[in-house]
């Protein structure tokens, strides 16, 4: 309450000192046709030095609006592709009409064709009508075809290897970063163009003042779609090992004044719906808060996914979401979001693991059957007032997650494990910023509270009993919730379920309840003069963690910090230097530390096509409560954790180099990045194995680790062939130390990954998509142990044939895996589908896993271990579905 009062008073005091701004309004049109020019770039500049004061893009009617504290010595400059640049002085504050003339380009005997990709300054535009085909189902399918853009399996969008910070539709973010709800539900042919905005600064009062490296993507809809409510219903059924279902219903309305997205989806065919509720975009960097993640002591098992999840996921999932965004006026927006997901998942897998310790090599083998249940409810309210002279953001969110995992584990012993793990969380973020001429100042506050109750139950069946007895015991425990039985199973409970008696079963319980509160509050200010931006931030961070086990334990910590920062920017280069000065205090550990964390960044543009950057930083951090918790606890059925209670300190040096080239005319994009990291630690993790358990602890011992990485991405589009190709190459090496039985071992892990992709549509009748991943990893442990490099190759080829309104699609996958130096495995998988479209109807028949492969095996290395695993695949399955979509004009738009 005190914090809220202080924030309100500061906001009020800041507000009363803000002077009125001069607003410049205008319209940009073609000089000959008088037609409005949409998305023209309009900049307000200082006469003489050319410094940008503010900038914006014109709307569909060619209109724009800019604000400035003064109109003295200001000019307006307008850029638009295919037109001459025009600069006019700003004399009085009145509506402007700016007419642009088309550029006449005379080229002898050269045929000029409009391109699919073009750009000016920091905005790159893709004409999606040149990329979309009748075989594309949604926007995500089209984005995969764009040169320079990559869409990962979970829907994450990257431009030149960088994750986008925001995805907009008509300049508005209705999903709040959960953009799969847009890309997976919006029709492919509904979008006119996609705009990539580099150096994206959504806060108007900071444009032209401070540097940002964010990249945003804006989707421009076709005019007839903006005024529509789009309803889509899909229902499908089929059969595999059991009856299958797949259903969805979504409603979209994406106008420029308000936007709505309602969705409901359900399936048990292996389609992961969690990504629809996942925030894939982090938002603008100025509003980004560094938060220490809530501590989780008893995590649920999360096995690796070596294949696409549709091959491995045995699920029953239902999800629903509602998103509503209102544009209150030109500067204010209000957004509501609510989502819920219910999921039941089963997994069957096993692993043979080898741990290479200093004095011994440990072999373990397990087979598991996991049953996971998840319920998650989340909501968010976001208000923004984004004007040229001020910026206000108030964001409140909540999330509740209830998880329960039951595992039947066989190997050397028969073990039953159950973990209940919940998380309830409240967050509030507030930012108030003001700008007056060259000065900017504001306040920022973030508060989070998290409650995490968790319970682990492990039942060991080490006694020589029959498999029938084991099945009865498992039945007893598995039906506990169904029969409303207590967690502590006794003989009477067992007799209730099975009608029999049994000996005392060795049972272990671990119950931990964690409360974690975190806050970060700061005052900041900046001044830009002669192209140099001087910034100063000062703030306070605090965290209180409380753990209730057999004993109660709390660990408060707090920090005071100040960040002086300088940005020196010219037309071709940018230099930033900062030094975060910290004073950290952990009173319970009697720990205090004062240190500085400097950083340096340099960027140079050789030309509009070439640019490079260099960076270096030194940082220091302390471990979380998991590292200083002084009591032992069982993390799972075979892992026991016990730390010393000492504060873990990590000092990190990071150096990066980045080179980029892009040629929009030739549709060619290329990046090269290299990094080197050196970490120094005061504590070393020790892992020992005894009596079927791994014991994890930490001891005071200084040591270091190193990592090197090289990554390059090339993407090329060919207009005449309707072709996109891309290639990504990654090389990495990690070096460090491990501790076992008080003996230190060095280790080194090397990794290579090559990922080519091809999308080719030579005609409307035929389309080919090819993707491959070639990877190789090898380890060296100690002086004598060398793990032979193993190759893994995954290839997928998809062929699509179209005949009028019918498409036939065949997809084949081949996996080559080295299981050892002398043993390898080939796996073939195939799917087929037939799609018929008739008006607003879409009919689909499909068959998955045609060869009915039951299992997939693979071998992987980590730094100090190797494991050969198997996982159960979804069987051969057949599905039919029907989809119907209609669009209805909005009453307000008509």
Where are the regions that the model predicts?
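Membrane-proximal, glycine/serine-rich, low-complexity loop/turn segments characteristic
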Residues: 21, 61-63, 84-94, 115-406, ...
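Conserved C-terminal beta-signal and adjacent last beta-strands/turns
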Residues: 753-776, 784-890, 894
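Outer-membrane beta-barrel translocator domains and adjoining extracellular loop/strand segments
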Residues: 207-209, 273-279, 346-363, 404-413, ...
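A short, solvent-exposed loop/turn motif at the edges and junctions
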Residues: 46-51, 73-88
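Outer membrane beta-barrel strand-and-loop segments of large Gram-negative receptors
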Residues: 518-520, 551-555, 559-561, 648, ...
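Short, acidic Ser/Thr/Gly-rich low-complexity loop/linker segments typical of extracellular
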Residues: 48-63
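A short, amphipathic beta-strand motif
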Residues: 24-30, 62, 98
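Short, ordered, surface-exposed loop/turn motifs in non-cytosolic proteins
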Residues: 32-46
């Amino acid at each position: 309450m005190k914090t809220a009062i202080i924030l309100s008073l500061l906001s009020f005091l800041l507000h009363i000192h803000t002077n009125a701004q001069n607003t410049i309004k205008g319209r940009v049109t073609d000089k000959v046709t008088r037609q409005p020019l949409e998305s023209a770039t309009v900049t307000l500049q200082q006469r003489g030095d050319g410094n940008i004061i503010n900038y914006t893009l014109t709307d569909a009617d060619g209109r724009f609006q800019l604000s400035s504290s003064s109109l003295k010595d200001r000019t307006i400059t307008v850029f638009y592709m295919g037109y001459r640049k025009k600069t006019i002085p700003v004399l009085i504050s009145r509506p402007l009409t700016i007419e642009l003339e088309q550029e006449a380009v005379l080229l002898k005997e050269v045929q000029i064709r409009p391109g699919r990709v073009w750009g000016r300054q920091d905005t790159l535009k893709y004409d999606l009508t040149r990329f979309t085909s009748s075989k594309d189902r949604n926007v995500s399918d089209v984005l995969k075809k764009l040169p320079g853009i990559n869409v990962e399996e979970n829907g994450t969008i990257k431009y030149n290897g960088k994750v986008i910070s925001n995805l907009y539709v008509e300049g508005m973010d209705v999903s709040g970063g959960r953009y799969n709800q847009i890309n997976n539900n919006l029709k492919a042919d509904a979008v006119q163009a996609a705009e990539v905005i580099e150096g994206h600064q959504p806060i108007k009062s900071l444009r032209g003042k401070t540097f940002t490296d964010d990249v945003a993507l804006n989707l421009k809809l076709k005019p007839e779609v903006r005024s529509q409510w789009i309803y889509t219903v899909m229902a499908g059924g089929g059969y595999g090992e059991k009856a299958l279902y797949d259903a969805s219903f979504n409603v979209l309305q994406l106008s420029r004044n308000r936007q709505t997205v309602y969705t409901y989806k359900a399936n048990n065919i292996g389609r992961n719906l969690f990504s629809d509720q996942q925030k894939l975009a982090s938002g603008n960097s100025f509003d980004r808060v560094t938060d220490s993640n809530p501590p989780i002591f008893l995590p649920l098992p999360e096995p690796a996914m070596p294949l696409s999840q549709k091959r491995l996921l045995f699920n029953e999932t239902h999800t629903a979401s509602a998103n509503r965004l209102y544009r209150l006026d030109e500067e204010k927006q209000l957004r509501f979001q609510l989502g819920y997901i219910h999921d039941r998942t089963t997994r069957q897998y096993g692993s043979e693991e080898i741990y290479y310790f200093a004095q011994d090599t440990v072999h373990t083998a397990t087979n598991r059957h996991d049953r996971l249940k998840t319920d998650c409810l989340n909501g968010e309210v976001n208000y923004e007032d984004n004007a040229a002279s001020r910026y206000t953001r108030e964001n409140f969110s909540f999330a509740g997650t209830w998880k329960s995992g039951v595992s039947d584990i066989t190997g050397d012993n028969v073990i039953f494990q159950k973990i209940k793990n919940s998380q309830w969380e409240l967050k509030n973020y507030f930012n108030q910023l003001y700008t007056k001429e060259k000065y900017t100042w504001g306040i920022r506050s973030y508060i989070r509270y998290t409650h995490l109750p968790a319970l682990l139950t492990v039942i060991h069946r080490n006694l020589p009993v029959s498999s029938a007895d084991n099945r009865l015991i498992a039945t007893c425990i598995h039906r506990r919730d169904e029969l409303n039985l207590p967690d502590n199973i006794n003989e009477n409970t067992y007799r209730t379920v099975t009608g029999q008696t049994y000996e005392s079963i060795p049972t272990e319980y671990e119950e931990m309840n964690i409360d974690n509160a975190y806050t970060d509050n700061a005052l900041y200010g900046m001044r830009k003069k002669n192209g140099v931006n001087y910034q100063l931030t000062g703030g306070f961070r605090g965290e209180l963690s409380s753990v209730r086990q057999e004993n109660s334990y709390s660990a408060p910590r707090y920090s005071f910090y100040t960040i002086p920062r300088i940005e020196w920017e010219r037309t071709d280069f940018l230099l930033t230097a900062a030094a975060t000065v910290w004073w950290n205090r952990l009173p319970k550990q009697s720990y205090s530390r004062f240190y500085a964390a400097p950083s340096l960044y340099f960027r140079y543009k050789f030309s509009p096509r070439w640019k490079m950057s260099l960076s270096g930083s030194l940082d220091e951090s302390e471990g979380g409560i998991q590292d200083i918790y002084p009591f032992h606890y069982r993390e799972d059925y075979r892992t026991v954790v016990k730390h010393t209670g000492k504060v873990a300190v990590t000092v990190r040096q990071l150096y990066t180099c980045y080179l980029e080239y892009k040629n929009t005319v030739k549709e060619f994009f290329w990046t090269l990045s290299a990094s080197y990291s050196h970490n120094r630690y005061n504590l070393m993790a020790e892992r020992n194995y005894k009596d079927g358990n791994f014991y994890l602890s930490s001891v005071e011992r200084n040591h270091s680790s190193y990592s090197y990485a090289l990554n390059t991405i090339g993407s090329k589009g060919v207009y005449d062939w309707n072709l996109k190709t891309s290639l990504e190459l990654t090389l990495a090496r990690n070096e460090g130390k491990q501790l076992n039985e008080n003996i230190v071992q060095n280790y080194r892990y090397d990794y290579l990954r090559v990922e080519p992709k091809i999308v080719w549509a030579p005609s409307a009748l035929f389309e080919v998509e090819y993707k491959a991943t070639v990877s190789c990893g090898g380890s060296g442990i100690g002086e004598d142990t060398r793990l032979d490099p193993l190759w893994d190759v995954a290839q997928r080829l998809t062929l699509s044939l179209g005949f009028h309104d019918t498409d036939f699609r065949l997809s084949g996958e081949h996996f080559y895996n080295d299981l050892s130096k002398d043993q390898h495995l080939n796996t073939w998988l195939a799917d087929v589908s037939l799609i018929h479209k008739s008006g607003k109807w879409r009919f689909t028949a499909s068959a998955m896993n045609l060869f009915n492969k039951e299992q997939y095996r693979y071998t992987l290395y980590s730094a100090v271990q190797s494991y050969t695993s198997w996982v159960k695949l979804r069987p051969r399955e057949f599905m039919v579905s029907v989809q119907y979509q209609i669009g209805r004009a909005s009453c307000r738009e008509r």
